[in-house]
Amino acid sequence: MFQFEIQATCSNTGARCGCFHTPHGPVTTPRFMPVGTLGTVKGVTTSQLAETGAQMVLSNTYHLHLQPGEEIVADAGGLHRFMGWDGPMLTDSGGFQVFSLGDLNRIDDEGVDFRNPRNGSRILLTPERSMQIQMRLGADVAMAFDQCPPYPATENDVAEACRRTHAWLGRCADAHQRDDQALFGIVQGGCFPHLRDLSARTVASFNLPGIAIGGVSVGEPVEEMHQIVRQVTPLLPADRPRYLMGIGTLREMAVAVANGIDMFDCVLPTRLGRHGTALVGGERWNLRNARFRHDHTPLDPNCPCIACRQHTRAYLHHLIRSEELLGLTLLSIHNLTHLIRFTTAMGQAIRDGCFSEDFAPWEPSSRAHHTW
């Protein structure tokens, strides 16, 4: 039911393109995945989302458990029917969000005891409970419950998080009982090479349908993140999709693809859109800026999205300055389209044998007149 086929590789780098087959359709790689935390990609309908080229969409176990609750989603027929999305979906375990909360009472080998920010009640989230919730939600891919250490953290603290993550992965694997849902493990280890090595080898030993690299983009220097990717990917099975969590900038995705990463997710495109910022080439444009007031050209002539096809920079500037919701929606659609087209273009370049020339190393200034 879940199969990953590699269709082409780059002879000069570790880049590869392929297809991850799921019960709700294929996911071509490399692939950027929009984040729909609460069963919605903020400000965008599912029809608009489909027009961006999105294939797989993420939702958040922690947030959906709090509101509306996995029972309501299950009663609707699962997350796909609940939100009206018939393509592949992935749910993260909720671990990152729980560990990001300030009001934690207990983290131990059993799980995490925390206070519900909505009503103050106590919640115990364990590997088994995370699997129960994710199985009820019914996404194509469920992520294992892991402990993501903060940055910076001591070696002892990161080692303890690794030990706990590996033990919890075993419990997740035992508790996960849906054949139509793939379980992905998560590599931790912070910025300590020997711990990343240990975690990669341990998670790979579970022989799961896919593996993610977690604990990146949490405040560490960018070059350290690059080094983690370079170190970890050769230790992961070549015939499984590799997912770098929380990454969504062009340069970081290009560097990661050059080192064998297949999948990405990030809230960045919609967050920027909601703040009036557009991604164009390798730049971020603040559409509030007065320089766009009389600019009646498309936002990006190379982009096929509705914002670029039907509207001008001056109109988008007007919407943002007027605080019209349409402006935020149009910029979110554009930014999503931009990142998805970028990963699609990397895949095509791998097939065409020109990835190393066009994307690795990739710098924004060299791609100002892009054609993707």
UniProtKB/Swiss-Prot annotation:
EC number: 2.4.2.29
Residues given in the record as Zn(2+) binding sites: C303, C305, C308, H334
Molecular function as annotated in GO: metal ion binding; tRNA-guanosine(34) queuine transglycosylase activity
GO CC entries: cytosol
Cofactor: Zn(2+)
Keyword Transferase: yes
Record's keyword annotation contains Chloroplast: no
Pathway membership, UniProt: tRNA modification; tRNA-queuosine biosynthesis
Key words of the record: Glycosyltransferase, Metal-binding, Queuosine biosynthesis, Transferase, tRNA processing, Zinc
Pfam short name (any one): TGT
Record's catalysed reaction(s): 7-aminomethyl-7-carbaguanine + guanosine(34) in tRNA = 7-aminomethyl-7-carbaguanosine(34) in tRNA + guanine
Positions that bind substrate: D92, S93, G94, G95, F96, D146, Q188, G215
GO biological process, one term: tRNA wobble guanine modification
Subunit composition and interactions: Homodimer. Within each dimer, one monomer is responsible for RNA recognition and catalysis, while the other monomer binds to the replacement base PreQ1.
Role description: Catalyzes the base-exchange of a guanine (G) residue with the queuine precursor 7-aminomethyl-7-deazaguanine (PreQ1) at position 34 (anticodon wobble position) in tRNAs with GU(N) anticodons (tRNA-Asp, -Asn, -His and -Tyr). Catalysis occurs through a double-displacement mechanism. The nucleophile active site attacks the C1' of nucleotide 34 to detach the guanine base from the RNA, forming a covalent enzyme-RNA intermediate. The proton acceptor active site deprotonates the incoming PreQ1, allowing a nucleophilic attack on the C1' of the ribose to form the product.
Family, as annotated: Belongs to the queuine tRNA-ribosyltransferase family.
Protein name: Queuine tRNA-ribosyltransferase
Naturally occurring in which organism (per UniProt): Synechococcus sp. (strain CC9311)
